[in-house]
Swiss-Prot record:
Residues 1-15, 67-72, 153-155, 224-232 are mitochondrial matrix. It is linked to Leber hereditary optic neuropathy: A maternally inherited form of Leber hereditary optic neuropathy, a mitochondrial disease resulting in bilateral painless loss of central vision due to selective degeneration of the retinal ganglion cells and their axons. The disorder shows incomplete penetrance and male predominance. Cardiac conduction defects and neurological defects have also been described in some LHON patients. LHON results from primary mitochondrial DNA mutations affecting the respiratory chain complexes. InterPro entries: Cyt_c/ubiquinol_Oxase_su3, Cyt_c_oxase_su3_dom, Cyt_c_oxidase-like_su3, Cyt_c_oxidase_su3-like_sf, Cyt_c_oxidase_su3_a-hlx. Its EC number is 7.1.1.9. Signal peptide: none annotated. It catalyses: 4 Fe(II)-[cytochrome c] + O2 + 8 H(+)(in) = 4 Fe(III)-[cytochrome c] + 2 H2O + 4 H(+)(out). It comes from the Eukaryota. This is Cytochrome c oxidase subunit 3.
């Protein structure tokens, strides 16, 4: 690294791709073992290996960017393109769920009673918990923007405050969604309605948990003075991801909760 004459980061040999691949093998094998032989040992080992790999890999990325200065402008540009492509792939991922929902709801089969929601399904009231969830996520979108602008203006205290509010709102959303699932009058086994509802909203809930974790890491890094007004792509990527989660929820609310009910 000391003698290179270009601005690109030539990553040194790392064990983490190997341990990551091993953890993926252990998790998938462990899942099969759990389903068929009711043993969670292999699955737990896979999850532990995966968690340790993620922690150590991202720790190395933080060291390379914050302390070693390897994330030069060309490298950051590549990271931005990578994040944009990742979010684009997530858009298509959710498009599949919306396709399944609209395919089933716009032309319901005779087996569903010829109408939507299917016979026997009592949908959730879109003006109760789902509307509260919508307002919570919209508020978190405002607070993450506040945090971003505070960071760009070198206002450290306001950035920390706004980021903490965003994380708490994300946690509140997750708790509301969990309570809604427990009180739901239908289950994932109740035909195509239950399947599309729980898979689409469940995967969105998973993305909220991932986004909240992403923001929590950014919060800890901000407390450790890792971000500056000019060098904070880790936080910017988390903000992009959070806005994506926001927009997906709006489509879910309008499609499944409001129109679909």
């Amino acid at each position: 690294m000391t003698h290179q004459s270009h601005a690109y980061h030539m990553v040194k040999p790392s064990p983490w791709p190997l341990t990551g691949a091993l953890s993926a093998l252990l998790m998938t094998s462990g899942l099969a073992m759990w389903f068929h032989f009711h043993s969670m040992t292999l699955l737990m080992l896979g999850l532990l290996t995966n968690t340790l790999t993620m922690y150590q890999w991202w720790r190395d990325v933080t060291r390379e960017s914050t302390y070693q200065g390897h994330h030069t402008p060309p490298v950051q540009k590549g990271l931005r393109y990578g994040m944009i492509l990742f979010i684009t792939s997530e858009v298509f991922f959710f498009a599949g769920f919306f396709w399944a929902f609209y395919h089933s709801s716009l032309a319901p089969t005779p087996q569903l009673g010829g109408h939507w929601p299917p016979t026997g399904i009592t949908p959730l009231n879109p003006l109760e918990v789902p509307l509260l969830n919508t307002s919570v996520l919209l508020a978190s979108g405002v607070s993450i923007t506040w945090a971003h602008h505070s960071l760009m203006e070198n206002n450290r205290n306001q950035m920390i405050q706004a980021l903490l509010i965003t994380i708490l709102l994300g946690l509140y959303f997750t708790l509301l969604q969990a309570s809604e699932y427990f009180e739901s009058p239908f289950t994932i086994s109740d035909g195509i309605y239950g399947s599309t509802f729980f898979v689409a909203t469940g995967f969105h809930g998973l993305h909220v948990i991932i986004g909240s974790t992403f923001l929590t890491i950014c919060f800890i890094r901000q407390l450790m003075f890792h971000f500056t007004s000019k060098h904070h792509f880790g936080f910017e990527a988390a903000a992009w991801y959070w806005h994506f989660v926001d927009v997906v929820w709006l489509f879910l609310y309008v499609s499944i909760y409001w129109w679909g009910s």
